[in-house]
Amino acid sequence: MDYKSGLIPDGNAMENLEKQLICPICLEMFTKPVVILPCQHNLCRKCANDIFQAANPYWTNRGGSVSMSGGRFRCPSCRHEVIMDRHGVYGLQRNLLVENIIDIYKQECSSRPLQKGSHPMCKEHEDEKINIYCLTCEVPTCSLCKVFGAHQACEVAPLQSIFQGQKTELSNCISMLVAGNDRVQTIISQLVDSCRVTKENSHQVKEELSQKFDTLYAILDEKKSELLQRITQEQEEKLGFIEALILQYREQLEKSTKLVETAIQSLDEPGGATFLSSAKQLIKSNVEASKGCQLGKTEQGFENMDYFTLDLEHIAEALRAIDFGTDEEEEEFTEEEADEEEGVTTEGHQ
């Protein structure tokens, strides 16, 4: 049984297989050796080395001084980052299976007859294949067009040489673009890290600011409680003094009321001898009672508590002026301190 013929299908399947054997860098069929990346995509080792060198311009290859550190590049198919050791792309594993499939595919293609129309033909000369490239008009054409046709006065070159040259140029452009994409990806990663660090720093300063304001709130609450306690203490002392006076005056009023009642009863006494026996003492008691009205009194403005008034406008202004410090303010403050120290030093020498 011919196993090779069973491996290579016919028709469109051949074209699909060929697409799977195309290198994403040079856009041609893989050139041996073929290396397999950790992401399971394949590259020609030469193409892999080109994009590796483009992404790591300071890495020296086998021909130069040996670098003890590896490098990295991204797979052109999936953008997976490939990390190399000090051997570079020569440390990548060869994909022998793909190389064998390429050999079988080429054998099968060479054994098949060339299908009609598989090679591009000239539109002016239908039996002539396009085999040269007009450098003047920058279009592929045939030999008859150069000898007899529209491109007699044009400069031409072999189609294959121009084909290989432009393919090489395009491959170089792809390598440069892939390397550029790697640099852009690095910048994106740096910017993402910058966003993360910015958020972390913002959270940290917010926490610090909240703690400082909480400290201010605690100081204000403590001072408020202290001042309210002093007002309450003063109130209690004054009220105690006033209530003591009220008690004294009530006792005096009670004594005076009883004395008045006794005196009125004495006035109703019809007998002179009886009246006179108590009148002198009653008169003396009334005089003393009238003097008792001279008990202590509160001074004018005793009830006033205005001396506990606070002027907090300057503190309120200072609170409103709270703001974040700037580097310029810190520099000015440092310069002022330096000037003051210099002045003190000068005076000391004098």
From Swiss-Prot:
<feature type="compositionally biased region" description="Acidic residues">
    <location>
        <begin position="325"/>
        <end position="344"/>
    </location>
</feature>
<dbReference type="GO" id="GO:0005829">
    <property type="term" value="C:cytosol"/>
</dbReference>
<dbReference type="GO" id="GO:0043161">
    <property type="term" value="P:proteasome-mediated ubiquitin-dependent protein catabolic process"/>
</dbReference>
<dbReference type="GO" id="GO:0030018">
    <property type="term" value="C:Z disc"/>
</dbReference>
<dbReference type="InterPro" id="IPR027370">
    <property type="entry name" value="Znf-RING_euk"/>
</dbReference>
<dbReference type="GO" id="GO:0031430">
    <property type="term" value="C:M band"/>
</dbReference>
<dbReference type="GO" id="GO:0008270">
    <property type="term" value="F:zinc ion binding"/>
</dbReference>
<dbReference type="Pfam" id="PF13445">
    <property type="entry name" value="zf-RING_UBOX"/>
</dbReference>
<keyword id="KW-0862">Zinc</keyword>
<dbReference type="GO" id="GO:0043292">
    <property type="term" value="C:contractile muscle fiber"/>
</dbReference>
<keyword id="KW-0514">Muscle protein</keyword>
<dbReference type="GO" id="GO:0014904">
    <property type="term" value="P:myotube cell development"/>
</dbReference>
<keyword id="KW-0833">Ubl conjugation pathway</keyword>
<comment type="function">
    <text>E3 ubiquitin ligase. Mediates the ubiquitination and subsequent proteasomal degradation of CKM, GMEB1 and HIBADH. Regulates the proteasomal degradation of muscle proteins under amino acid starvation, where muscle protein is catabolized to provide other organs with amino acids. Inhibits de novo skeletal muscle protein synthesis under amino acid starvation. Regulates proteasomal degradation of cardiac troponin I/TNNI3 and probably of other sarcomeric-associated proteins. May play a role in striated muscle atrophy and hypertrophy by regulating an anti-hypertrophic PKC-mediated signaling pathway.</text>
</comment>
<dbReference type="InterPro" id="IPR013083">
    <property type="entry name" value="Znf_RING/FYVE/PHD"/>
</dbReference>
<keyword id="KW-0808">Transferase</keyword>
<dbReference type="Pfam" id="PF00643">
    <property type="entry name" value="zf-B_box"/>
</dbReference>
<feature type="binding site">
    <location>
        <position position="122"/>
    </location>
    <ligand>
        <name>Zn(2+)</name>
    </ligand>
</feature>
<keyword id="KW-0539">Nucleus</keyword>
<feature type="coiled-coil region">
    <location>
        <begin position="207"/>
        <end position="269"/>
    </location>
</feature>
<keyword id="KW-0175">Coiled coil</keyword>
<keyword id="KW-0963">Cytoplasm</keyword>
<dbReference type="GO" id="GO:0071549">
    <property type="term" value="P:cellular response to dexamethasone stimulus"/>
</dbReference>
<feature type="zinc finger region" description="RING-type">
    <location>
        <begin position="23"/>
        <end position="79"/>
    </location>
</feature>
<feature type="region of interest" description="Disordered">
    <location>
        <begin position="325"/>
        <end position="350"/>
    </location>
</feature>
<dbReference type="GO" id="GO:0080008">
    <property type="term" value="C:Cul4-RING E3 ubiquitin ligase complex"/>
</dbReference>
<dbReference type="InterPro" id="IPR001841">
    <property type="entry name" value="Znf_RING"/>
</dbReference>
<dbReference type="InterPro" id="IPR017903">
    <property type="entry name" value="COS_domain"/>
</dbReference>
<feature type="binding site">
    <location>
        <position position="125"/>
    </location>
    <ligand>
        <name>Zn(2+)</name>
    </ligand>
</feature>
<dbReference type="InterPro" id="IPR050143">
    <property type="entry name" value="TRIM/RBCC"/>
</dbReference>
<comment type="pathway">
    <text>Protein modification; protein ubiquitination.</text>
</comment>
<dbReference type="GO" id="GO:0010468">
    <property type="term" value="P:regulation of gene expression"/>
</dbReference>
<dbReference type="GO" id="GO:0005634">
    <property type="term" value="C:nucleus"/>
</dbReference>
<keyword id="KW-0863">Zinc-finger</keyword>
<feature type="zinc finger region" description="B box-type">
    <location>
        <begin position="117"/>
        <end position="159"/>
    </location>
</feature>
<feature type="binding site">
    <location>
        <position position="151"/>
    </location>
    <ligand>
        <name>Zn(2+)</name>
    </ligand>
</feature>
<dbReference type="InterPro" id="IPR000315">
    <property type="entry name" value="Znf_B-box"/>
</dbReference>
<protein>
    <recommendedName>
        <fullName>E3 ubiquitin-protein ligase TRIM63</fullName>
        <ecNumber>2.3.2.27</ecNumber>
    </recommendedName>
</protein>
<dbReference type="GO" id="GO:0006513">
    <property type="term" value="P:protein monoubiquitination"/>
</dbReference>
<dbReference type="GO" id="GO:0014894">
    <property type="term" value="P:response to denervation involved in regulation of muscle adaptation"/>
</dbReference>
<feature type="region of interest" description="Interaction with TTN">
    <location>
        <begin position="74"/>
        <end position="218"/>
    </location>
</feature>
<keyword id="KW-0479">Metal-binding</keyword>
